[in-house]
């Protein structure tokens, strides 16, 4: 006779599964308890199992967490040099401690936590973490690394409780946790001051909270239901606030939510009022909370970075003027013809400074390039000159101050090269439908296409509305002959243009098109009084937020492989699940402590096979379903498949496939969140296959033996490759035995030969 304990036992379940399934409400437990008392033998078995379970719930997570801390923290300070991307993220943490504004492609939460680790370690932010340099005595880098290692270590108990929440048997929960503990790539990167462990932690915690929320679906709107819903949203917000890769786990939760709402729509027991409440609750928990977390991180970011720093130029000019120690906005308030040296900034999202350099366009007019450039540079400096056909302004007119006015026509001349800003009916290098903009001629040589009309579109403040004022005047620049408008296209030039932004002359431009809006950012003129007492208006947080995120995306999109340069650590996505390559994380000399980023073969290769098997499995189930065959008829088995196989596969695909198709340069560490879901799928197959053996007494021992053997292989494999994670000292030839594949660059860098 088949028995069912609460919601977690069926004909296909084993005794080991009794207490590992979905939550048991009090009434169900009491009914099951009374029912089982009629069968004394089964009653004793369940009671004994329950006692073991309570012990297991407390003791095993602690043991596993301690093991995880060991693998991440053992010999964590052995290498006292700046290792790999510690050079980036340690420096960013220093900026927070110095309160200097900087620019990076990633959202701020992870780097703020790096800064917090430095603060807790007593570091004052005075060092910039030069790559490969020895840490100075006044930086307690071990404490900073331990702070990061805690995030990686805490993934272990999260994996344990996730396995329980999604319905794994005890053996599979243990196996899944062991796979996470003894994964060399996690142990290696978990030692250093990086963002990867933080991203992994919030990704893992997001799926854990989703799994717990899933177990509460029979008790909607209860306190625990709300708790796990809000915690899911909180962790999603943190994940995307560390790296934009957090969008992938948000997509997983979004698809899960849509599926659940679709199922509720077909449930006749759910009234329309309740259904609408389900929508509103999820909008609050899974949209509003993550968005608020994301916005809050940027608000704290702006508040902390109140001083001028290396990233100022990526932000609007008015924002830069609000920073302490800035040079922006310190010049005279009115711009004069000839004598005023200015820089001009575009106001589109990701807008940069008008720029020119001596290199010509390789095609088209072959005249001097005009671009936009995001950083301060002498090649950003221009000045206004009288139009072609009129006597040019010269220094001899030192007693005459002629201010630049809106509605008037001028030439713009590049200060360093003396050439005119020019356009003509030549296609732009990237945006072929628009006109090319170049620098051409000189003060005497040129044509009437050098003449531009200044159109003022917005004035902030109460100054003379007819004049150009630095920062507070927004204007457009229209060619007097062709009628097109100077604009930043938003596209980047190839390597011959140093990957700077393309400048075009737009033929058809709306007045509200911010790509055609410009403002003067810096202004120098010794003949005019300085406007030091002028108070600039505050910029809005949301405009600053949008501008910074646009600049982040533009910088990220510019990180494309350069075919003319060799990148020894870049790789292709197909090489990650196959372990085709690893990454040298530091100097590779005899005297240095060397680390090699590579996944554990004992877990990565089987997990990749499991993912491929599951893809075939899902296709097979889909074909059966289309033929109206019954699939996954057991509700418990179906629930485990959904949360332990289907959604992990979806998460694997969403985390992996973007790196297959994206054009930017990618590295092996991008696979770490993806690997977590592959390990979950591998554990699911162990659970599903071996559970069928347990229907016979001999099968139970066979099942236990399979777990013990494979778990031992995983642990032994970790320690075999532990030099990768704990550090390799001495000659690299001593570790040649670890190079199982010729592409593993343990002894020699074969990709650079």
Swiss-Prot record:
Which residue positions carry a glycan here? 124, 324, 398
Q: Which residues cross the membrane?
A: 51-71, 149-169, 175-195, 236-256, 283-303, 603-623, 640-660, 666-686, 704-724
- The EC number of this protein is 2.4.1.109
Matches recorded under Pfam families: MIR, PMT, PMT_4TMC
GO terms for MF: dolichyl-phosphate-mannose-protein mannosyltransferase activity
GO BP annotation list? fungal-type cell wall biogenesis; protein O-linked glycosylation; protein O-linked mannosylation; regulation of endoplasmic reticulum unfolded protein response
Protein induction: Specifically induced upon tunicamycin, DTT as well as rhodanine-3-acetic acid derivative OGT2468 treatment.
Reaction catalyzed: a di-trans,poly-cis-dolichyl beta-D-mannosyl phosphate + L-seryl-[protein] = 3-O-(alpha-D-mannosyl)-L-seryl-[protein] + a di-trans,poly-cis-dolichyl phosphate + H(+); a di-trans,poly-cis-dolichyl beta-D-mannosyl phosphate + L-threonyl-[protein] = 3-O-(alpha-D-mannosyl)-L-threonyl-[protein] + a di-trans,poly-cis-dolichyl phosphate + H(+)
Pathway given for this chain reads: Protein modification; protein glycosylation
> What does the UniProt entry report for the null mutant?
Affects O-mannosylation activity only when PTM1 and PTM2 are absent.
Intervals, Lumenal compartment: 72-148, 196-235, 304-602, 661-665, 725-753
What are the UniProt keywords, alphabetically? Endoplasmic reticulum, Glycoprotein, Glycosyltransferase, Membrane, Repeat, Transferase, Transmembrane, Transmembrane helix
Q: Where in the cell is it found?
A: Endoplasmic reticulum membrane
What is a single cellular component term in the Gene Ontology annotation? endoplasmic reticulum
Bilayer topology reads: Multi-pass membrane protein
Q: Name the Gene3D superfamilies for this protein.
A: 2.80.10.50
**Primary localisation category:** endoplasmic reticulum
The subunit field of the Swiss-Prot or TrEMBL record says:
PMT3 and PMT5 form a functional heterodimer. Also forms a minor complex with PMT1.
Additional detail = Present with 2720 molecules/cell in log phase SD medium.
Q: Which family does it belong to?
A: Belongs to the glycosyltransferase 39 family.
User: What does this protein do, in the record's words?
Assistant: Protein O-mannosyltransferase involved in O-glycosylation which is essential for cell wall rigidity. Forms a heterodimeric complex with PMT5 and more rarely with PMT1 to transfer mannose from Dol-P-mannose to Ser or Thr residues on proteins. Seems to have redundant activity to PMT2.
The name this protein goes by in its record: Dolichyl-phosphate-mannose--protein mannosyltransferase 3
Q: What lineage is on file?
A: Eukaryota, Fungi, Dikarya, Ascomycota, Saccharomycotina
Q: Which gene codes for it?
A: PMT3
């Amino acid at each position: 006779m088949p028995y069912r304990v609460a919601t977690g036992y069926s004909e296909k379940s084993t005794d080991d599964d009794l207490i590992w399934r979905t939550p048991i409400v009090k009434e169900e437990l009491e009914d099951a308890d009374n029912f089982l008392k009629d069968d004394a033998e089964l009653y004793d078995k369940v009671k004994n199992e329950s006692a073991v379970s309570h012990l297991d719930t407390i003791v095993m997570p602690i043991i596993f967490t301690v093991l995880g801390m060991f693998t991440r923290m053992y010999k964590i300070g052995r290498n006292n040099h700046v290792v790999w991307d510690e050079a980036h993220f340690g420096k960013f943490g220093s900026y927070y401690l110095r309160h200097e504004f900087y620019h990076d492609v990633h959202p701020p939460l992870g780097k703020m936590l790096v800064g917090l680790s430095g603060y807790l370690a007593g570091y004052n932010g005075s060092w910039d973490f030069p790559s490969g340099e020895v840490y100075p005595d006044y930086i307690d880098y071990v404490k900073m690394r331990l702070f990061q290692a805690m995030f990686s270590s805490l993934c272990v108990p999260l994996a344990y409780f996730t396995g329980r929440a999604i319905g794994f048997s005890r053996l599979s929960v243990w196996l899944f946790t062991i796979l996470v503990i003894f994964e060399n790539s996690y142990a290696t990167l978990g030692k250093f001051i990086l963002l990867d462990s933080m991203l992994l932690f919030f990704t893992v915690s997001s799926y854990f909270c989703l799994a717990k929320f899933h177990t509460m679906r029979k008790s909607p709107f209860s306190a625990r239901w709300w708790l796990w819903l809000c915690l899911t949203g909180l962790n999603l917000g943190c994940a995307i606030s560390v790296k934009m890769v957090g969008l992938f786990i948000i997509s997983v939760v979004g698809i899960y939510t849509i599926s659940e709402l679709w199922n509720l729509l077909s449930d006749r027991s759910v009234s329309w009022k309740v259904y609408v409440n389900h929508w509103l609750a999820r909008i609050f928990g899974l949209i509003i909370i993550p968005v608020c977390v994301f916005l809050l991180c940027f608000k704290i970011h702006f508040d902390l970075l109140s001083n001028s720093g290396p990233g100022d130029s990526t932000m609007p000019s008015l924002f830069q003027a609000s920073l302490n120690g800035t040079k922006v906005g310190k010049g005279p308030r009115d711009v004069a013809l000839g004598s005023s040296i200015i820089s001009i900034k575009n106001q589109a999202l990701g807008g940069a400074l008008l720029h020119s350099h001596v290199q010509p366009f390789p095609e088209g007019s072959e005249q001097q390039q005009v671009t936009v450039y995001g950083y301060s540079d002498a090649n950003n400096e221009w000045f206004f000159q009288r139009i072609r056909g009129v006597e040019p302004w010269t220094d001899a007119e030192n007693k005459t101050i002629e201010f630049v006015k809106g509605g008037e026509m001028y030439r713009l001349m590049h200060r360093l090269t003396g050439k005119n800003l020019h356009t003509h009916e030549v296609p732009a290098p990237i945006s072929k439908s628009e006109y090319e903009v170049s620098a051409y001629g000189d003060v005497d040589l040129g044509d009437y296409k050098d003449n531009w009309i200044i159109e003022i579109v917005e004035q902030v403040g109460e100054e003379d509305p007819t004049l150009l004022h630095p920062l507070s005047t927004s204007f457009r620049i229209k060619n007097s002959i062709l009628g097109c408008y100077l604009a930043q296209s938003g596209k980047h030039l190839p390597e011959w243009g140093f990957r700077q932004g393309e400048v075009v002359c737009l033929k058809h431009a709306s007045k509200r098109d911010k790509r055609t809006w410009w403002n003067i950012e810096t202004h120098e003129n010794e003949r005019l009084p300085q406007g030091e007492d002028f108070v600039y208006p505050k910029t809005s947080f949301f405009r600053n937020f949008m501008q910074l995120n646009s600049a982040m995306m533009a910088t990220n999109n510019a990180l494309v492989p350069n075919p003319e340069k060799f990148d020894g650590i870049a790789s292709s996505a197909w090489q990650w699940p196959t372990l085709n390559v690893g990454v040298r994380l530091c100097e590779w000399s005899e005297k240095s402590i060397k680390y090699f980023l590579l996944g554990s073969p004992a877990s990565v290769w089987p997990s990749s096979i499991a993912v491929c098997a599951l893809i075939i499995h899902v296709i097979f189930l889909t074909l059966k379903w289309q033929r109206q065959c019954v699939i996954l008829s057991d509700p418990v088995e179906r629930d485990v498949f959904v949360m332990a196989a289907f959604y992990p596969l979806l998460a694997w695909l969403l985390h992996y496939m973007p790196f297959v198709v994206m054009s930017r340069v990618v590295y092996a560490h991008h696979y770490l969140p993806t690997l977590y879901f592959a390990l979950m799928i591998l554990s699911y197959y162990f659970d599903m296959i071996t559970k069928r053996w347990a229907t016979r007494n001999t099968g139970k021992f066979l099942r236990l033996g399979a777990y013990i053997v494979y778990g031992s292989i995983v642990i032994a494999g970790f320690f075999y490759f532990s030099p990768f994670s704990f550090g390799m000292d001495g000659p690299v030839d001593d570790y040649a035995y670890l190079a199982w594949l010729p592409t593993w660059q343990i002894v020699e860098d074969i990709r650079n030969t």
